[in-house]
């Protein structure tokens, strides 16, 4: 009866240098601190909103 939580893998492909402070903070909030760093995160509405805010700096893959 329990639903599996959908997961996404995000990889930072763009640099935060020269970006607005909010975008830098969002990357840090996602746990990304350097180029080519990856994290697997639960696909909650909060996480997807953060990803949407910096989508131009990320590569996003859905995991099964």
Swiss-Prot record:
Keywords associated with the record: Ribonucleoprotein, Ribosomal protein
CDD domains, alphabetized: Ribosomal_L30 (cd01658)
GO terms, molecular function: structural constituent of ribosome
Keyword Flavoprotein: no
Gene Ontology CC, one term: cytosolic large ribosomal subunit
One BP annotation, GO: translation
Keyword Ribonucleoprotein on entry: yes
InterPro entries given in the database record: Ribo_uL30_ferredoxin-like_sf (IPR036919), Ribosomal_uL30_bac-type (IPR005996), Ribosomal_uL30_ferredoxin-like (IPR016082)
Chain residue ranges for the region called Disordered: 1-22
Family of this protein: Belongs to the universal ribosomal protein uL30 family.
Subunit and partners: Part of the 50S ribosomal subunit.
Family annotation (PANTHER family): LARGE RIBOSOMAL SUBUNIT PROTEIN UL30M, MITOCHONDRIAL RIBOSOMAL PROTEIN L30
HAMAP family for this protein: Ribosomal_uL30_B
Protein name (record): Large ribosomal subunit protein uL30
Species this protein is from: Acidiphilium cryptum (strain JF-5)
């Amino acid at each position: 009866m329990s639903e599996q939580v959908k997961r996404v893998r995000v990889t930072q492909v763009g640099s935060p240098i020269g970006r607005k402070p909010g975008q830098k903070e969002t990357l840090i909030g996602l746990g990304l601190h350097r180029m080519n760093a990856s994290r697997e995160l639960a696909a909650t509405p909060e996480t997807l909103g953060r990803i949407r805010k910096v989508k131009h700096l990320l590569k996003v893959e859905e995991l099964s």
